[in-house]
Amino acid sequence: GVWKPRTRPGCFEGVGQEALRWLQRVKSELGMYVSTEVATAVHVEQALAAGIDLLWIGARTTANPFAVQEIADALRGVDVPVLVKNPVNPDVDLWIGAFERLYNAGVKRLGAIHRGFSAYGEKFYRNAPQWQLPIEFRRRMGDIAMICDPSHIGGKRELVLSLSQQALDLNFDGLMIETHCNPVCALSDARQQVTPDELEIIMSKLVRRSADSANADFRSYRNSLDEIDDKLMELLVKRMAVAREIGAVKREKGLTVFQPFRYNKTIERYTKYCKDGKIDIEAVKSIFEAVHSESIRQQLRVVNEGNE
């Protein structure tokens, strides 16, 4: 990017407007499309004046509705494609809201970039992929093309290939990979940069699988999954009925709704199913956290009946 919003001051924040002239040379001498990140209305005006073909909104900017609205207003009446990175925090509604602001301003050529989400204490990835969030975005915004930024997700060049393949396996429409002729000398994000030769190798190893699964074999499996899901829903409804009955007993006996010891024992009991690797322990915890949260909500409703 010509401009680079950084987490802390003092880091390289881009060359600025001067770099637009470099992009103009690339476009005129090599015939390539050029793009840059924009974070303010001034950036938009300068980029458009320089003939930049595509703009993108960075993660930190997406997280600020005021900044997105300012950019949307600056783009009103302009036919230029705009890509929007997910916000740094895992909030699908905030991401969708950025698209709504742009669309309402008349920007119709829109695309999404998944670059991962900040997570306190994250060690392996620079930004946790949390694939379920871009999947939910696509479920709700199916017409929006989505590309993946494995460089920012991984934060390490050795993760770019595997993350790129995961994105393609999830039917992403493309990739945004950072490359540098000499990554050691890169002024920012040097650890995640790959050389052009390395990029060529990565691209040669990627496999694009067919998204067409409309055949009899898949229909059979999906019918089986539907039957299992129906049973799961029936059991969840029964479980919540029992939770409400427990709430009534707790109300009668003056007991607190949340019982930490009981919850911890439940988690311990079911994580034993994870030992053979057939299901991830974090997935089990996540499932039971969601079920327990709804059980607590149901019990609180019973305990507080008549107190609203």
Model-derived features: positions:
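Catalytic alpha/beta core domains of metabolic enzymes, predominantly
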Residues: 67-198, 207, 213-216
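Short, acidic/polar
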Residues: 39-46, 159-164
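Glycine-rich, proline-tolerant flexible connector loops at the mouths of alpha/beta enzymes
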Residues: 1-18, 180-190, 246-257
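Domain-level signature for soluble enzymes in the chorismate/prephenate branch of the shikimate pathway
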Residues: 211-308
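Alpha-helix-loop-beta-strand connector modules within alpha/beta enzyme cores
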Residues: 11-36, 71-81, 131-146, 192-211, ...
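Structural recognition of alpha->loop->beta junctions
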Residues: 47-61, 102-110, 166-173, 276-278
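Catalytic beta/alpha-barrel core
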Residues: 15, 31-40, 44, 53-67, ...
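Active-site mouth loops of central-metabolism enzymes
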Residues: 8-14, 32-38, 58-59, 88-90, ...
